[in-house]
Amino acid sequence: ANYNVPDGSYSTDPYQPATRVKEFKQMVQALHRAGIRVIMDMVYNHTFNTVESNFERTVPGYFYRQKEDGTLANGSGCGNETASERPMMRKFMIESVLYWIKEYHIDGFRFDLMGVHDIETMNEIRKAVNKVDPTICIYGEGWAADTPQYPADSLAMKGNVSHMPGIAVFSDELRDGLCGPVWKKEKGAFLAGVPGAEMSVKFGIVGAIEHPQVRCDSVNYSQKPWAEQPTQMISYVSCHDGLCLVDRLKASMPGATPEQLVRLDKLAQTVVFTSQGIPFIYAGEEVMRDKQGVGNSYKSPDAVNAIDWRRKTTNGDVFMYYKRLIDLRKSHPAFRMGDAEKVRKHLEFLPVEGQNLIAFRLKDHANGDSWEDIIVAFNSRMTPARLEVPVGKYTVVCKDGVIDVRGLGTQIG
């Protein structure tokens, strides 16, 4: 593996080394012109080959962690794990990230199995990046595939993210609170109308921070808040690992009609985009991407992995809903306060009767929002629900899978 060169198979001529570099830069430039920032997936935690790797051939035994018996540690689940805590591996990672920023103008980095790396290295990367551009995004998977050969309290795991300011991790609490356990695809949760996941969803709504109305003893994977700030949590329901959203809904609700799948798809992403963390969408979800039930599709053909863009027409309603969700979040800072104290002050969960119903209020022009009070309610029941809200006249902007900021009518509280 060469971490500092684009892969040639994506270029128009893989046999001309300069072509991949030029075309990658042209791609980044074109995306920037379109107002899109570019985030790279960085897999420093392991290499495909150990003995023949550049690391091992440079200094044998140095760049990889070993067990006490001398065999390779395997926290990555891929045969080895790199030793990020060792000075030269740490130096390599920092300089590699800076190279991609300065040479290719990359805007962010997603660290694969970040839990294999040590906290100090991740913090040093954040500090080095801040000197160039503090707006560059750094986030990763706050877990490992197996147990790394390094003290758990020193690893960049989800539970240690409070020690990594400016670094975010994925929230599997919110994901599985909505969709069900990732390893039990037939088992649903909030979206499927299964009671008991409400607190896990609330945990995600506030951005995994401490909040007086979130009881962590009822949250699926975390018994305490792990984020100091809501910007340290990635809100999502699906990514390239595991089933895409449509396949997950079909697996947990095999009797669902196409119309129900559309409504649940919209409901899921509405939770994501009105939560205080950083929203994340898997490519193609906006057109209801379907991978034919294949979860781990890294070795599947294009017939499974390709995005069928004809779905943009057949599922145009869903596409426009996603677009309007994004516009809604961008237009209203109440949904992205970015500060834990503001969230605790302005986000208030409303009392509801029964389960499979969650409602909250963003009050008092939260984060300088033009709207004084915003009421958000999620109902995954098969029937309408009654909700008591503070006295007032409210303009409805999102209802029954339709968004229109001009208003869909009014309600009196």
Regions found by a protein language model. Give the residues of each.
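Conserved alpha/beta catalytic core and glycan-binding cleft of carbohydrate-active enzymes
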Residues: 126-127, 135-288, 298, 364-369, ...
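Carbohydrate-interacting/catalytic domains
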Residues: 261-262, 273-281, 285-413
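Conserved, mostly hydrophobic/aromatic
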Residues: 3, 31, 41, 100, ...
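Substrate-binding/active-site clefts of carbohydrate-active enzymes
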Residues: 1-104, 117-133, 137, 149
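Generic recognition of stable, solvent-exposed alpha-helical segments in well-folded globular domains
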Residues: 19-26, 35-38, 88, 92-95, ...
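Non-transmembrane alpha-helical segments in soluble domains
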Residues: 28, 97-101, 126, 130, ...
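Active-site rim elements
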Residues: 84, 110-113, 223, 249-262, ...
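Short, solvent-exposed turn/loop segments enriched in Gly/Ser/Thr/Pro and often Arg
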Residues: 1, 42-51, 113-118, 141-145, ...
